[in-house]
C-alpha cells in the first residue's frame, strides 16, 4: 500500500545505498517533496507509515512522517547487541519511545530475535521488539531473543482525541524558523553513489565519513581530543581504515 526507501544507511555497515546517495536521480523518478520521500497512506485502520532500522536512530525520518500525518509507524529493524539494544544502554527502547512521544504516534518496532548464521553469535540481534503508544509509553516488549508474538491495542480514536489537547501537544509549539539553518547546511554529502555507480567496497563508503568529520570539526561543532587540532581528524579515520584493512576486516580497493 506504500513504497518507502530507507533513508539512513550507516557508512560502516554493508554496501547498501540510500536515496540520498543518488539524490538527483532519485528525485527525477520519485519526486522532490517530503510527502513522496516519506509517504503516509490513509487507511480504514489509520494513517500508516514506515521507517527502516537506522532511520529510527535520529529524529528526522519519524519527524517527516509525523509532518505527513502518520498515526502508526511500522518499524522493522536488525539492531545488534553492540548497538545498545539491551539494558543498561537500552538505546533501542529509549530512542523509539522518544520518536513516538515527539510525533504523537504509535511505533511498532520489530527487531531480529536471533541470527542463525555460523559467523554470528546467537544473540547478535537480541530481539526486544516493542509496541509504543502516542505518549511514548511502552505497551509491550518481547523479553528475549527468539521468535515470538506480542500484542497491544492500537486505539486510533484515542490518539486523535489526544491530539486535540493543547497541553503537552508536541506539534503545537514547534517554532521552525529558529532551526532552519541546521538543515540548510549539509552534513553528509549527497549523490556520492549515483545510479549505475554503486560502492565497490566498504572502504569506499567509509571514505565519505572523512568529509563529514572534517565539516563537523572545521565549523567547531566537534572538539578534537586533547593535543590534536581539527585538520588532523580526517587522518585519524585514515589510520583506522588502514588498520582494519591490515587486519582483514575491511577490504582494500583492489580486493
Model regions and ranges:
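Solvent-exposed alpha-helices and their adjacent loops that cap or buttress functional pockets
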Residues: 33, 40-44, 100, 122-123, ...
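Active-site catalytic loop in hydrolytic enzyme cores
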Residues: 1-76, 80-94
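Intrinsically disordered, low-complexity boundary segments flanking structured domains
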Residues: 37-39, 94-96, 135-141
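Short alpha-helical segments used as structural interaction elements across diverse proteins
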Residues: 34, 93-96, 160, 172
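C-terminal beta-strand edge segments of enzyme domains
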Residues: 2-3, 102-106, 111-255
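Short, compositionally biased leader-like segments
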Residues: 84-110
